[in-house]
Amino acid sequence: MVYKSIFPTFVQNINLGQMTESERKQIIALIQREVIPAIGCTEPIAVALCVAKATETLGAKPEKIKVLLSANILKNAMGVGIPGTGMIGLPIAVALGALIGKSDYQLEVLKDSTPEAVEEGKKLIDEKRICISLKEDITEKLYIEVTCEAGGEQATAIISGGHTTFVYVAKGDEVLLNKQQTSGEEEEEETLELTLRKVYDFALTAPLDEIRFILETARLNKKAAEQSFQGDYGHALGKMLRGTYEHKIMGDSVFSHILSYTSAACDARMAGGMIPVMSNSGSGNQGISATLPVVVYAEENGKSEEELIRALMMSHLTVIYIKQSLGRLSALCGCVVAATGSSCGITWLMGGSYKQVAFAVQNMIANLTGMICDGAKPSCALKVTTGVSTAVLSAVMAMENRCVTSVEGIIDEDVDQSIRNLTRIGSQGMNETDRVVLDIMTHKGC
């Protein structure tokens, strides 16, 4: 689609001059760290990345690979497809990380995979050279420890706190990196305190050339959806929503297109399609959910390129803001957070002010808080679709100046406090839920 190049002035409801150049640059750097390409579900891919680093450090093909994981990593990697393999789960991701993985590729670590490598990986698995187990007595929800052995030597790599954050690398007794006492990435993020108001003002006032890069999320994630329409991935929810049922029940509408595009990209990703997407805060599904509803709404309503850029920036930065206090992994489904971002972007594209964007956030929190994460898997497309449908509903309510009030449930008069209530439930209140979910998943008779 060709976007209009002329954009009307929109200075009302913006705290002009409140943000320093240094703070603006910090925010841009934060977004560039958090919004990056990924192929495949980021938890098994992060494990493959850690294996690749340990293998590179060892300097030889491993004869044995020992992997220790936090419960949340284990949960998110059990039932998801691994790109280019036609297989599900961690063992093949570990094997390919050792055989063809390149740590420089980050979350695209397996993009050089070939059918021959997959066959070789199957042999490693069959020969029982890979051992995967739960890391006991740790508080980190995102923790990956890999030790590779060959010829009497060994190398270890540890990722903690972020999907690409290496905190420890060693070969034998030689320690090459040790940041285990402090997580550099988390410290860096904590120095930048965001609020919804700050997110809104940044998205609408940042120089366009400094934030134009966010358009890559639209290109990559829309392409993923379009590729999914041509295939048969996962539960094929996105493809199904473009067929007979879409027209009979929902009509050929912006709403139905938002659902089909978003779920299609998720279908392909969770089924293990070798299709890159732009992730947000370590999650491809969050990147998809923060991007495609905004893109589809903008395109089908004739919005300008600048409007799309600013709406995408508002959406993605809202997700990053909420994830700062929620954490990378939790018992709370990430689509709750990501769809909240897209609801903000859509509300603004509808002509909403800051007040109405805040209303949309309140409506989202009142509706979806508590949706559990029971691992990454093809049925995530269903949850993503639930999230983005609620995002549209919340935006429509906000534009009618309808908002869940502070006497209702966990909603506070202050939208930022409501966000903190959401993340407190997800990071503290649902810890036992997380444990029970993993227990159920690991004791099923399948």
Question: Which residues does each predicted region cover?
Answer:
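Conserved phosphate/anionic-ligand binding catalytic regions in large, soluble enzymes, centered on
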Residues: 37-53, 275-292, 333-337
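Internal helix-turn-beta structural module
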Residues: 360-446
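Acidic-glycine-rich active-site phosphate/pyrophosphate-binding loop
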Residues: 17-28, 60-73, 253-272, 304-322, ...
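Short, positively charged and aromatic/hydrophobic N-terminal segments
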Residues: 3-15
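Hydrophobic alpha-helical bundle architecture
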Residues: 54-55, 297-310, 320-386, 399-406
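Flexible, glycine/charged-enriched surface loops at secondary-structure junctions
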Residues: 61-65, 105-110, 131-133, 208-215, ...
